[in-house]
Structures are given as structure tokens and as C-alpha cells.
Amino acid sequence: MFMGEYRHTVDAKGRMIVPAKFREGLGEQFVLTRGLDQCLFGYPMNEWKLIEEKLKALPLTKKDARAFTRFFFSGATECELDKQGRVNIASSLLNYAKLEKECVVIGVSNRIELWSKVIWEQYTEEQEDSFAEIAENMIGFDI
């Protein structure tokens, strides 16, 4: 399981050090793809295969299913960590998430998310005020 928030940088070659606590969970190969809210999602291969099966089961006749599947898979790339624990992020993904120098890597249960520091700070500031309301609206979810 992935959890926590870490600050890192993306170098001029588009490489970022993956937090040590996430490396083992991601494994030797993992998938990075466009996520929601202008971040990137990173999945270990076993989790990616589960998502792949669910998305393949969506009806081809549904416009939203086709659109989401295209969005999700067309942005996906298989990644490996180098000996320094860095991942080379595709330029299309860097552009999508507006990852420049400073970034934030968070753990979200079965995946990691890579955020631009600026976008993450805006997102958390916006969500902070509505966190209690969001939790209240989650039907059947008790902590």
C-alpha cells in the first residue's frame, strides 16, 4: 500500500527520484499514465493488469467508456527505475501534468500520484475547506 507525501524535483532530462518507500511497491516495472485532476498515476504491474481488465470490460458502444479508455491507455507508458531510483517521465506526461522542477509524489492506496507542486498546493487548499463535507457525502463510508 502506498501512502504519504514527498517533495522531489524533476531534472532537465525529465527524471525524478521515486521515494524510497515507494520503490519496492512499484517493482522493477510499473506504469505511468495520465491521471485525473491534472496529475499522473503510477501503478505496479499487478494493479495495472486489474485496471486493464476492468477497462476492457467496458461496453464499446458507450461514448464515455471509449473516451476514458482512450485517454487512460494512450497516455500510459511502462517505466523502470534506474540504479539511482529515478524514473524517466515521458515528455507528453510531463506536459500533461505541468511537471517542471518541483513536484509532489503522494501515495494513494494502490497507486502513486505525481503532481506539480503548484497544482498540488492549489488542489489541497481548495479541498481543505470541503474535506468534512466530502466525507459526509460518501455514502456507506465510515471511518
UniProtKB/Swiss-Prot annotation:
Domain SpoVT-AbrB: 5-47, 76-119
GO molecular function term, any single one: transcription cis-regulatory region binding
Family named by the database record: Belongs to the MraZ family.
Naturally occurring in which organism (per UniProt): Bacillus velezensis (strain DSM 23117 / BGSC 10A6 / LMG 26770 / FZB42) (Bacillus amyloliquefaciens subsp. plantarum)
One cellular component term from this protein's GO annotations in UniProt: cytoplasm
InterPro entries assigned to the protein according to its UniProt record, in alphabetical order: MraZ, MraZ_C, MraZ_dom, MraZ_N, MraZ_sf, SpoVT-AbrB_dom, SpoVT-AbrB_sf
Keywords from the named record: Cytoplasm, DNA-binding, Repeat, Transcription, Transcription regulation
Protein's UniProt name: Transcriptional regulator MraZ
Taxonomic classification: Bacteria, Bacillati, Bacillota, Bacilli, Bacillales
Compartment(s) where it occurs, according to its Swiss-Prot or TrEMBL record: Cytoplasm, Nucleoid
GO-annotated biological processes: negative regulation of DNA-templated transcription initiation
Signal peptide: none
Record note on quaternary structure: Forms oligomers.
NCBIfam families given in the database record: division/cell wall cluster transcriptional repressor MraZ
